[in-house]
């Protein structure tokens, strides 16, 4: 019965819901991936990966504005953000081996901002009461719909010969199933359970994984300044989250003392 329900098409209920799905499809797929992938043509993978990791900061601010989550953002949160931005700056301006390119860095920051809107829309979609599979399918529908016009603005050519290459087929399979379908399903499920801000916290691990992968797969060189920048980014973002928790704990203890 559950399989029949999830395989059935999602019914139309209201234009408000459809606009939410469309907004998620636009921000989560074409805008985010185009900005990130174009950034990769200007900057190194490790550089882009670290800068995009500031998405949780934008998500917290966006969620505060549109979802009223987590209450008021405390000063400690912004202190952590400043530390993270210092780390990002060190990575972006760390010398010749990182191939400084402001265009790539700006596009990476833009991708992080776009993702924050997708995270908030994911939370709104989760409140519609549909299954995660239904939500992901409808989001993908609009994402592909918005992606088609982009083909006319880029040098896109059909080359069926490429599909005879095992590496090419593997890359498409990995990006389509692993990095897209599975990731979007698990992301939407996590947002439904944890919320937009808490789920975005796990993006903190992205620069570490990206930096390691760029060394192993792409043979990129990571300088000492880059390593320092990564530490500051992760430390600053984690500090802002921990400080928020400490603030809530202190507030709770203060309330208990007043009651006593």
Go through the PLM ranges and name each one:
Residues 33-37, 57-60, 92, 115-120, ...:
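Residues that mark transmembrane-helix kinks and helix-interface sites
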Residues 1-13, 65, 85-99, 142-166, ...:
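Membrane-interface helix-cap regions at the ends of transmembrane helices
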């Amino acid at each position: 019965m559950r399989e029949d329900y999830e395989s059935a098409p999602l019914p139309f209920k209201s234009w408000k819901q459809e606009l939410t799905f469309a907004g998620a499809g636009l921000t989560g797929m074409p805008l985010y991936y185009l900005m990130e992938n174009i950034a990769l043509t200007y900057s190194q993978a490790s550089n882009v990966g670290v800068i995009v990791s500031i998405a949780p900061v934008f998500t917290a601010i966006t969620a505060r504005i549109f979802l009223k989550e987590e209450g008021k953002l405390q000063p400690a949160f912004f202190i952590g953000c400043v530390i993270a931005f210092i780390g990002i700056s060190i990575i972006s301006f760390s010398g010749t081996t990182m191939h400084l390119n402001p265009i790539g860095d700006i596009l990476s920051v833009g991708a992080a901002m776009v993702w924050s809107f997708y995270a908030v829309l994911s939370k709104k979609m989760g409140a519609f009461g549909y299954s995660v599979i239904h939500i992901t399918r409808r989001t993908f529908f609009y994402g592909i719909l918005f992606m088609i016009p982009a083909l006319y603005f880029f040098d896109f050519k059909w080359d069926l010969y490429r599909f005879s290459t095992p590496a090419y087929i593997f890359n498409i399979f990995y990006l389509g199933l692993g990095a897209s379908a599975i990731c979007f399903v698990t992301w939407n499920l996590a947002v439904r359970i944890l919320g937009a801000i808490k789920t975005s916290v796990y993006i903190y691990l992205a620069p570490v994984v990206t930096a390691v992968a760029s060394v192993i797969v792409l043979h990129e060189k990571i300088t000492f300044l880059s390593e320092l920048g990564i530490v500051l980014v992760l430390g600053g973002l984690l500090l802002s989250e921990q400080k928020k928790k400490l603030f809530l704990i202190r507030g709770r203890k203060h309330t208990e003392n007043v009651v006593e």
